[in-house]
Amino acid sequence: MLDSYQRKIDYMRISITDRCHFQCAYCKSDHPRKLKHQDILSYEQLLLIVDQAIQLGINKFKITGGEPTIRKDYLFFIKELKKREVEVTLTTNGSLFTKKDLDFLKKIGIDGINFSIDTLDLKEYFLLTRQNCLETVLD
C-alpha cells in the first residue's frame, strides 16, 4: 500500500483504549470525553481489522492508548498479534507493568516497548503527570 507520495505504508497504530490514569498537562483535556465500554472495539473486532491490514501489506503494529496496560487482557491481544508473525511495539507510561508482564512480553517476542518518560526529575515528573511513580517506572 502506498500513500499519495508513493511511500510504502507498512505500519498501523492501534489505540486499544482512550483511558489513562495519568493526568499529563500536555495530554489531558479539561473536559475529557471517554467512550462507553460498548463503543470500544473488542479484541476480536480489532483482530479482524489486523487481518485485513496484513492482507494490504501492513506488517508492523504499534499498540497505544490512552494507557494500553489499563485495558484488561492487553497481553492476550499482543500475543494474538505475534501469532500473525508481525512486528509489534507497545507504547506505555510503564507505571502498571509488573516483572511478570515484562517476562511474558519477552517470551512471546514483542519487538519493542516504548516508555514515555518525560523527565528524570521527581518534582517535574509529578508536575507533568500528576503521578508520584517515577521510581516505579524506572525500576
Say what each PLM segment does.
Residues D3, R7, K123-F126:
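Flexible, active-site-adjacent loop/turn segments at secondary-structure boundaries
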Residues S4-E44, L56:
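Canonical Radical SAM [4Fe-4S] cluster-binding loop centered on the CxxxCxxC motif
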Residues Y43, L47-I63, I70-D139:
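Radical SAM/AdoMet-radical enzyme domain recognition
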